[in-house]
Amino acid sequence: MFTIETKQMDIIIENVCNEKAKDLFYQMLINYEIYKTMAEMLDENMKKLNFYNFAKTQTCHMNDGLFGELEYAEYQFVYQMKVIGNLIVLITSAHRIMTCIKQARANEKCKDWRIVSEEIEKCDKIFDNKLRNFMEHLEEKVYKQEVTNQNCHFSPQRILYCKDEKTDKQFDFNNEQLKMIDNLIDNILKMLSARKEKRGNLSHMEC
């Protein structure tokens, strides 16, 4: 039932010597499960939101009546809130994943990390502190009525726009873009698996 997850855990157990790094890899996998769940929910909720956006533009009083139009507007609002909630959790979990990865690399100091260094840098620029902080404090800003469509909104094309005194950022949450985290973790696990073949070369692993 949990074949993939079990295999991922085994790779870490068998190929990571540094105990602190091992704990960080476990935390990475926990946050990755959250990330994957949010990515699926986000995709589903965006599809529903776009459906109701389209339905509202096509409605008319003759067929649906005033209450039909209001019903579509309510669905729009509900799914907008769901998408924002999904984005907050997804971005936070991705930032935690990147933090775990960078700290694990710092603890291990292994040369094989060079294989994924460019991927780490690219993902780190996307899921940076500014984006994470903006989304984490979004609920508070909404409560204080400090957020408008100019500060935070997203498009049907799945682009999130964030702007305040500290942040001016666009975040692409299309499925292909979100797979960057999947690809990074997959390549890190491949990197760890390759250590089994090089176990005799202690200078390579430095552990």
Please report, for each region that a protein language model flagged, where it lies by residue.
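Amphipathic alpha-helical interface segments
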Residues: 1-124, 154-207
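Histidine-centered, metal-coordinating catalytic motifs and their short helical/loop contexts
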Residues: 122-147
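Short linear, low-complexity motifs centered on an aromatic residue
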Residues: 143-158
